[in-house]
């Protein structure tokens, strides 16, 4: 592991993520691939090397018990394939890490973000980086805007002014940003969604409001990694920073490997998406297949992989019910 380093594993993850994503016929919405970005924290062993490389977060003046790594990933939501990732220390904001994903985002995409990524500079740069690179995000509380035109019920074209600080940081940012504001009521709660999809004819407002709920898929993906793959272990294994980075790229690579096999399984099931299959059961199947391949002749490998792809019927999930309670953060005791 020490001779290999982290860069080689990063390159393998990046290359395979691109290849597998491009090889998958993802379902589209109005011609757009559905993506999401979100952050996740990883705890590292408490060693002097990790402590120096990954400064601890403090709460009320008290340092965290372990050094931590902050990561932001981008995921295709119907397959759960990770398409890009960036990580740093707790001193890096998630927006800083998200900036590294701009150039890795493909054309004809819609990226769903939570309110923590609200930055007109970041959102504007996201749109301008390619062709039809759209985004959707909850409007920041207290944000000031001017309504330009009504597009439908609870649907307006709006103009938002940018700050001098944002224009200084983002040279391509003008004095104003034009966007579309949707006001919807879900389960009695009013929600304001801001998006770059300003063409009301191409992008129906009623469908867009329901679309944002799919952002939760990336959180489910993180749960699959931490609970199933990591067996709910709270701390990574590596005691040196270089190996911590290598381990993280390896975890993402292994997750995508399982997810790509689930894509192959779903192709054999009519009307099923890969995210409607059991990750834990599929992960077990892939692990057993890897052990089988060790003793198989090269000529049998294609047949064994076809057999694995045909087993999707065994890992179908029941219809997912709605969340029974809102997401909450427990208070400290």
Label each region the model flagged:
Residues 3, 7, 11-16, 24, ...:
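Single, function-defining residue in the core of a domain
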């Amino acid at each position: 592991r020490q001779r290999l380093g982290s860069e080689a594993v990063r390159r393998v993850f990046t290359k395979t993520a691109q290849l597998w994503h491009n090889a998958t016929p993802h379902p589209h919405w109005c011609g757009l691939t559905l993506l999401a970005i979100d952050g996740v924290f990883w705890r590292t062993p408490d060693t002097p090397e990790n402590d120096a490389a990954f400064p601890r977060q403090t709460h009320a003046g008290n340092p965290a018990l372990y050094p931590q790594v902050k990561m932001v990933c981008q995921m295709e939501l119907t397959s759960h394939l990770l398409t890009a990732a960036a990580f740093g220390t707790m001193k890096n904001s998630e927006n800083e890490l998200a900036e590294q994903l701009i150039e890795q985002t493909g054309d004809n995409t819609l990226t769903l973000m939570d309110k923590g990524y609200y930055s007109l500079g970041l959102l504007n740069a996201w749109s301008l980086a390619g062709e039809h690179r759209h985004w959707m995000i909850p409007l920041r509380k207290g944000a000031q805007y001017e309504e330009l035109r009504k597009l439908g019920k609870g649907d307006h074209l709006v103009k938002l002014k940018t700050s001098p600080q944002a224009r200084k940081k983002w040279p391509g940012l003008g004095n104003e940003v034009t966007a579309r504001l949707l006001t919807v009521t879900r389960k009695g709660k009013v929600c304001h969604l801001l998006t770059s999809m300003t063409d009301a004819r191409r992008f129906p407002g009623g469908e867009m409001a329901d679309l944002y709920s799919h952002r939760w898929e990336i959180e489910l993906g993180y749960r699959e990694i931490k609970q199933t793959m990591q067996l709910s272990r709270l701390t990574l294994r590596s005691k040196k920073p270089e190996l911590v980075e290598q381990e993280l790229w390896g975890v993402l690579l292994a997750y995508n490997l399982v997810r790509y096999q689930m894509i192959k399984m779903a192709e054999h099931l009519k009307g099923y998406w890969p995210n409607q299959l059991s990750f834990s059961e599929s992960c077990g199947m892939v692990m057993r297949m890897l052990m089988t391949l060790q003793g198989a002749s090269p000529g049998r490998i294609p047949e064994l992989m076809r057999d694995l792809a045909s087993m999707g019927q065994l890992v179908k999930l029941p219809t997912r019910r709605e969340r029974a309670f809102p997401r909450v953060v427990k208070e400290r005791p």
